[in-house]
Amino acid sequence: MDVNPTLLFLKVPAQNAISTTFPYTGDPPYSHGTGTGYTMDTVNRTHQYSEKGKWTTNTETGAAQLNPIDGPLPEDNEPSGYAQTDCVLEAMAFLEESHPGIFENSCLETMEVVQQTRVDRLTQGRQTYDWTLNRNQPAATALANTIEVFRSNGLIANESGRLIDFLKDVIESMDKEEMEITTHFQRKRRVRDNMTKKMVTQRTIGKKKQRVNKRSYLIRALTLNTMTKDAERGKLKRRAIATPGMQIRGFVYFVETLARSICEKLEQSGLPVGGNEKKAKLANVVRKMMTNSQDTELSFTITGDNTKWNENQNPRMFLAMITYITKNQPEWFRNILSIAPIMFSNKMARLGKGYMFESKRMKLRTQIPAEMLASIDLKYFNESTRKKIEKIRPLLIDGTASLSPGMMMGMFNMLSTVLGVSILNLGQKKYTKTTYWWDGLQSSDDFALIVNAPNHEGIQAGVDRFYRTCKLVGINMSKKKSYINRTGTFEFTSFFYRYGFVANFSMELPSFGVSGINESADMSIGVTVIKNNMINNDLGPATAQMALQLFIKDYRYTYRCHRGDTQIQTRRSFELKKLWEQTRSKAGLLVSDGGPNLYNIRNLHIPEVCLKWELMDEDYQGRLCNPLNPFVSHKEIESVNNAVVMPAHGPAKSMEYDAVATTHSWIPKRNRSILNTSQRGILEDEQMYQKCCNLFEKFFPSSSYRRPVGISSMVEAMVSRARIDARIDFESGRIKKEEFSEIMKICSTIEELRRQK
């Protein structure tokens, strides 16, 4: 049946159809190859925006650095990073005047956090630049490697387990004349295989000690590794993002804690809240502006876009802000917070893997690593790449580029929001001292500006003043990409406002479908996504019912588990038909075992196993929920699991779903090909780390987990816990005397082994 698409929209207000214009169906674009070109673009652009600044040379690393602060104010509309220190400080002072005690209180809250945070806070987060191996690693491994190197170099403050003590080690490490690190390498030998008598290449992984002098260590400590941002929709060009190393992360965390605490107290801030809470906050600001614009006043809203927000921000400005925010605070606290911006003023951007060359004629491929870009003959490159390399050469050191101005993506979201809000705050009548006034919303680089004035000239004047005020602190509102409307219709962080927020359902589209974790989790996540969208995103009952049917269909095709009485032939159908015929109560079979679907929009909150439990044959129940079933490598599952769902914009969200452990909750095994590479040593470290943590959790289940007081190693803690538990179990008669004495013997043996070591 052909549907004329325009008919669909006859009854729909235009703003509700906004969803259909979003590029959110189908697979998002991914990047291939190296990010070197994108990173060079970022570095070159950042320097271009600040080109009239002062050049200096870093005395420790020898890197050329550009400082645009208090530079000449722009005379045109081009983006620029010449923030004026006194203007930023004044904006902070006015922000404090409008919110008495805000900085003071946030500092007190942060001080408490600083003293209590444990170093394991840094294990959160995904990829982290590991300076010991000069490449990216999972955060936990990178942290473990850093601590291991610190300890072998006599830096042991971190043993207390507090993050602030680890950071003391970081500061101390920068004064050391040299650091000794352990790196992984691989050797190849040709040997004859006994079985096949063929020659094979054998790879062995070794660890070797290496000394790094002060300059090289500092460069590594200040390095941000770069990657290409994947899965960005609606853009033709890819762009680079940064992953900082462990030395920087802890300091950034404390600065962002302070800034988050400030943002929570600012009504114009779109961070750190999200979802419905954010919508409520925004609706309040709009309501305020609309009620205050009496019949005599006009009210207009700009859906704002800033040009290259990160590349025009400056760490030196952030240092000024922190200095102001923490005035009158203890010296140690001010110092610890000022280190992050100082490190960022001296940061180095790692250029990534370099370029790949291939000769069509000779069928040869060769990689030019980033380290060689400083010296290689440029005749091999095309015009645009040649220009990039020529421009970046004065900044290169050891395959990294000095990048003093600018903030890489996503590092100081909260603090830059505070800066943005401080300009919105200046729109009050008592500051503008004229007939126009403004207010708005800020969330990282995204903003909406509401201007009220008696007439159109006033609105224009207000917008101009806002634009120029922003320029003074290095914020560049884009005149091309921002647009103005009567208040009541605007967009902010992909929320569309039309006398209230319109559900932008298209953004949720990517998270519908089968996740591909395992049969049990996928069923649960699928129905939870539909349930959540009925609650939050105007997914109506009829559409939800259709979504559910499509999901079940998709699920059956993915896992080849069509109903037992279907005609569809797959490689599972023989087994599933047999099961169908043997089962008395067919309604009790799970969908993944060829059973019928019992879900409808009323019971989406119930896990499938619970929904069908009463309908199941007894022997099926026994097979399904049997931890001793030998065919399943079974993990213990808490009642709630977390899935990562991909909404269309912003980072992957974590979504909770109910997990019932069954024989369908399998875990796929790790791909073996990694075991033959140089990553293998790293993998083994990681597995050992994992095993230790799992063992520790067995001794300290989360319900009884108290943070260890005093300093004891994991082993000591587990041994003493084992002794206490054994005694309680023995005295209450849960274990026999022989078992009790055996446990005690094992504990003593472990302690003995530790002493010998």
Swiss-Prot record:
Q: What are the UniProt keywords, alphabetically? A: Eukaryotic host gene expression shutoff by virus, Eukaryotic host transcription shutoff by virus, Host cytoplasm, Host gene expression shutoff by virus, Host nucleus, Host-virus interaction, Inhibition of host RNA polymerase II by virus, Nucleotide-binding, Nucleotidyltransferase, Phosphoprotein, RNA-directed RNA polymerase, Transferase, Viral RNA replication, Viral transcription
Tell me the segments the record calls region Promoter-binding site.
249-256
Signal peptide (residue range): none
Q: Identify the InterPro entries for this entry.
A: RNA-dir_pol_NSvirus (IPR007099), RNA_pol_PB1_influenza (IPR001407)
The answer to keyword Nucleotide-binding applying to this record is yes
Q: Where is this motif: Nuclear localization signal?
A: 187-195, 203-216
Q: Where is this region: Disordered?
A: 54-77
Limits of the RdRp catalytic domain: 286-483
Name this polypeptide is given: RNA-directed RNA polymerase catalytic subunit
Organism of provenance: Influenza A virus (strain A/Victoria/3/1975 H3N2)
